[in-house]
Amino acid sequence: MMPNRLEPELDIYQYPEHLRACLAPLPKGPGVYVFHGQSESLPLYIGKSVNVRSRVMAHFRAQGEAKMLRQTRHISFIETAGELGALLLEAQLIKQQQPLFNKRLRRSKQLCALRLQADTVTIAYAKEIDFAVTPHLYGLFANRHAALEKLRAIADEHRLCYGKLGIDKLPAGRACFRYSLRKCAGACCGVEPTQEHARRLGAALEQLRIACWPYAGRVALEEQGEALRQYHVIHNWFYLGSVSSLAQAQRLQSAASHFDSDGYKILCKPLIAGDYRIIELP
């Protein structure tokens, strides 16, 4: 069957005839959209946009997506109040439904961070402590190797001692090898005071600090769009869901089951910056 055009002004977009009815109602506002194949329980692709219609149309001019489009039977969408709600819902749905053509978003069993206590750095794992409420954690890493690679990079940039950081073993009574190369400031041999090394380490890590959850419990984050207002319910950086009223938000009592690194990355900056109205929930 020959492809058809949806609208004259959008003649660059081509689409299979059977998708005409799905494309017509797509909104020009923010939301999440889903490409469905034959299976109703396993979507092909889940995406989000501040303009759902425009983004979905763009899929039809991407040559690399021809395989997915051939399998698409219909397209659904969920409108949101704004971009933040779309980001949160997309991440939640991808993890829940694992669409075939999305990059997998799974809870990492090895999710870890650098933990600074006094002048000692260790690797802390999210499966062992709650990152949402534990202070002095820095960076979010998929595994121990990634965390140590970042620590090495920080040490190299700031002339910190591998031995003091636990990356290498220190030779008894001698300076580390990197000190002879002028890549270490000498905390290993007394040239740099231990307190100064600890201060510089803390300063170097600061940009990676994981913010502790700043509220006593659940909150509702209000997002107002042109035609829709939503309350996104969050607890310990974990997205519990979105509702249309505070009464519904108070009834949304699901507990955060684990530290959600995706939720943290989406929410931390706008929440701490005060970009949205926050209502603490009982």
Model-predicted segments: where are they?
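Conserved catalytic/ligand-binding micro-motifs in nucleotide and anionic cofactor chemistry
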Residues: 2-44, 48-282
